Amino acid sequence: MGPISAPSCRWRIPWQGLLLTASLFTFWNPPTTAQLTIEAVPSNAAEGKEVLLLVHNLPQDPRGYNWYKGETVDANRRIIGYVISNQQITPGPAYSNRETIYPNASLLMRNVTRNDTGSYTLQVIKLNLMSEEVTGQFSVHPETPKPSISSNNSNPVEDKDAVAFTCEPETQNTTYLWWVNGQSLPVSPRLQLSNGNRTLTLLSVTRNDVGPYECEIQNPASANFSDPVTLNVLYGPDAPTISPSDTYYHAGVNLNLSCHAASNPPSQYSWSVNGTFQQYTQKLFIPNITTKNSGSYACHTTNSATGRNRTTVRMITVSDALVQGSSPGLSARATVSIMIGVLARVALI
C-alpha cells in the first residue's frame, strides 16, 4: 500500500504512439464475480517486440494496483504502481523505463529481452484495503535469422548421385522445416531428414528433383525462410528420335533427317550411314537420293557431363518404283501425272 498511499512522484502516461492504446482506453472491466486473470499477448514474444499483460475480471472499485516481477509480492521486485483516485504512477526497484501501466491495470512491456521471460504478479488493492493477487507468464525468444541452404552437389547426375542440403545456421530451440516447389516435403523413400531436420538428403536424384527448395526455421515467436535453391540435374541422353518417321523414299527426292534426344546439358550429335561416319550435326541432309542411299541411318548422341551415349538406327529404302503410302518418295511431277491419269479414266467412264 505504500506506493498507493504515499507515491514518490507523479508521472504522465505516454499514451500517444503506443500499440493498443486506443483499445485500452475503452477496455474497462465492468463489475464481475469472475476470477481475476492475466492474459499475455503474445505469450511467446520475439526479442525487441512488445508484450501486453492484459488483465481480466478486475474486482469492483479497486483503489490501485502494483506489478511485481516473479510469482510473489516482493517490494524489492516491484515494477510499477498505480493509484486510481489521482492517476498517480509510482515506479519500483524493478522498473526499467520500458513498462507502461494502464487504468485497467494492464501492463505493456516494450523492447522485451530473454531476461524478461518468466512470471509477473499483479496486486489489486480493494476498497477495504485487502489485496488480491494473480500471476501470469510469458516467454521471450530470439528473432529467427534468415536461413540459407548449402549443398554438397549442385550438379548431380540422374540415377547416380545423392544430394545433401543443409539449412544454416544451427540455432538452439529451433524447428527446421523443408519446402519443395512451394509445398511441404512429400513422403518418399528417396527423401531423408537427419541432424534434427537440418539436413535433407535426396537419394538417387532424378530430373524431376530440380526444385526449388526452401528451408524454414521457426521458434514459438517467429519464423523465417531461406532463398529458394534449385538443382541442375544432369541427365540423358534419352534414346534419340529420328524424324520424319518414313522409311521408304523415291529416288530423286531430298533426304532430310533430324535427330533429337532429351539431355542436360544438350547432347552432341553425329550420323553414320551403313556404319560409315558422316558428320557431327543434329540434322542430316542428302540431296537427290538414289537407290545407293538405301541402308541403315544411325543417330548417335553423347552427353559428356553424364558420360552416357545412346544410338537409334533407322532403315531407309530408296526405290525407283513408287511405293504406296510413301509420300516423301513422290515427286511433284509424279503426283501430277497420277492425278491426270485418274481424271482421264473418269472422263472415259
Curated annotation (Swiss-Prot):
Superkingdom of the source? Eukaryota
Which residues are noted as glycosylation sites?
104, 111, 115, 152, 173, 197, 224, 256, 274, 288, 309
Q: Name one GO biological process term.
A: heterophilic cell-cell adhesion via plasma membrane cell adhesion molecules
Q: Recite the UniProt keywords alphabetically.
A: Cell adhesion, Cell membrane, Disulfide bond, Glycoprotein, GPI-anchor, Immunoglobulin domain, Lipoprotein, Membrane, Repeat, Signal
Where does lipidation (GPI-anchor amidated aspartate) occur on this chain? 320
Positions of the Ig-like V-type domain:
35-142
Positions of the pro-segment in this chain: 321-349
Tell me the CDD domains matching this sequence. IgC2_CEACAM5-like, IgI_hCEACAM_2_4_6_like, IgV_CEACAM_D1
The question of whether Cytoplasm is a record keyword is answered with no
All residue ranges annotated as the Ig-like C2-type domain in the record = 145-232, 237-319
Q: Which GO terms describe its cellular component?
A: azurophil granule membrane; cell surface; extracellular exosome; extracellular space; plasma membrane; side of membrane; specific granule membrane; tertiary granule membrane
GO MF annotation, one: protein heterodimerization activity
Which InterPro entries does its entry note?
Answer: CEA_cell_adhesion (IPR050831), Ig-like_dom (IPR007110), Ig-like_dom_sf (IPR036179), Ig-like_fold (IPR013783), Ig_sub (IPR003599), Ig_sub2 (IPR003598), Ig_V-set (IPR013106)
- Disulfide bond residue pairs: 167-215, 259-299
Q: How is it modified after translation?
A: Glycosylated.
Membrane topology according to the record: Lipid-anchor; GPI-anchor
Role description: Cell surface glycoprotein that plays a role in cell adhesion in a calcium-independent manner. Mediates heterophilic cell adhesion with other carcinoembryonic antigen-related cell adhesion molecules, such as CEACAM6. Heterophilic interaction with CEACAM8 occurs in activated neutrophils.
Instruction: Please provide the record's free-text comment about the domains of this protein.
Output: The N-terminus Ig-like V-type domain is necessary for heterophilic intercellular adhesion.
Family under the similarity heading: Belongs to the immunoglobulin superfamily. CEA family.
Query: Quaternary structure per UniProt?
Result: Monomer. Heterodimer with CEACAM6; heterodimerizes via its Ig-like V-type domain.
What name has this protein been given in UniProt?
A: Cell adhesion molecule CEACAM8
State the species of origin: Homo sapiens (Human)
Gene field: CEACAM8
